[in-house]
Curated annotation (Swiss-Prot):
Pfam (any one): LpxC
Protein's UniProt name: UDP-3-O-acyl-N-acetylglucosamine deacetylase
Molecular function in Gene Ontology: metal ion binding; UDP-3-O-acyl-N-acetylglucosamine deacetylase activity
Described purpose of this protein according to its UniProt entry: Catalyzes the hydrolysis of UDP-3-O-myristoyl-N-acetylglucosamine to form UDP-3-O-myristoylglucosamine and acetate, the committed step in lipid A biosynthesis.
Origin organism lineage: Bacteria, Pseudomonadati, Pseudomonadota, Gammaproteobacteria, Enterobacterales
Pathway: Glycolipid biosynthesis; lipid IV(A) biosynthesis; lipid IV(A) from (3R)-3-hydroxytetradecanoyl-[acyl-carrier-protein] and UDP-N-acetyl-alpha-D-glucosamine: step 2/6
Listed EC numbers: 3.5.1.108
Organism: Enterobacter sp. (strain 638)
Cofactor(s) the protein needs: Zn(2+)
Length: 305
């Protein structure tokens, strides 16, 4: 049986909040089978839980938030959520003593290292996947995203920002997902932002944690970071990282082929909600026999060592 995964032990890290610029302590806790992914704000009394749920997602200019029925939110969840998807973590409680997850270096890599440091434990309960049975597509002007049936998890993403620095890079990235591929090819790709946007936001007391340490920063012509890019096509790789995190907001790894053109957090979420709302378009599946599991979700040696 392919089993659900959680952490072996509690781990903790500190970082800076993108919005406040203040220190945030992040604690990742193991959770029992069928708990799901739960984000928790411990700065509130009593603490408030935000279960990962496609319907709770709000996209802001700066980040992705989860919002509850009382309009309380937890911000900047997308990169940690991508790391959870990448390593196939089904059950976890994520605590922060702030309104936001720390931005770290703007990628998912610090979260991957933290999860691997905690160790991954299999629980004696079948892991549920969402399998796509029918094509579902959403559009917004010239932007679109779709899922098609596929026995694995593939992603094909194209960006078009009409910006000299971004146009000079390769703007399409496609891959067959696996934990190894995610860690090597996607997890280190950083978020990017425009200097003028960051300066404007900071002048209004927002994005106070925004810096060259946690993003690729571009002006109207070029990348401003002294160290340059981690990958020639880091921009599109990061958009794929975002999509992996967005699509894991249903709390389950997805078996299907994802293709997107100029999509972002909001459209990715719209696609996920469109899939889940169409009962005949998907089904839950479990695997008794590892031989039947799509290669995409085979546990890498580095994870279950």
């Amino acid at each position: 049986m392919i089993k659900q995964r959680t952490l072996k032990r509690i781990v903790q890290a500190t970082g800076v909040g993108l919005h406040t610029g203040k220190k945030v302590t992040l604690t990742l806790r193991p959770a029992s089978a069928n708990t799901g992914v739960i984000y928790r704000r411990t700065d509130l009394n009593p603490p408030v839980d935000f279960p990962a749920d496609a319907k709770s997602v709000r996209d802001t200019m700066l980040c992705t938030c989860l919002v509850n029925e009382h309009d309380v939110r937890i911000s900047t969840v997308e990169h940690l959520n991508a790391a959870l998807a990448g390593l196939g973590i089904d059950n976890i409680v994520i605590e922060v003593d702030a309104p936001e997850i720390p931005i770290m270096d703007g990628s998912a890599a610090p979260f991957v290292y933290l999860l691997l440091d905690a160790g991954i434990e299999e629980l004696n309960c079948a892991k549920k996947f969402v399998r796509i049975k029918e094509t579902v597509r959403v559009e917004d002007g010239d932007k679109w995203a779709e899922f098609k049936p596929f026995n694995g998890f593939s992603l094909d993403f194209t960006i078009d920002f009409n910006h000299p620095a971004i146009d000079a890079s390769t703007q399409r990235y496609a891959m067959n997902f696996s934990a190894d591929a995610f860690m090597r090819q996607i997890s280190r790709a950083r978020t990017f932002g425009f200097m003028r946007d960051i300066e404007y936001l900071q002048s209004r007391g927002l994005c106070l944690g925004g810096s060259f340490d946690c993003a690729i920063v571009v002006d109207d012509y070029r990348v401003l970071n002294e160290d340059g890019l981690r990958f020639e096509d880091e921009f599109v790789r990061h958009k794929m990282l975002d999509a992996i995190g967005d699509l894991f907001m249903c709390g389950h790894n997805i078996i299907g082929a994802f293709t997107a053109f100029k999509s972002g957090h909001a459209l990715n979420n719209k696609l996920l909600q469109a899939v889940l709302a169409k009962q005949e378009a998907w089904e839950y599946v479990t695997f008794e026999d590892e031989a039947e599991l799509p290669l995409a979700f085979k546990a890498p040696s580095t994870v279950l060592a």
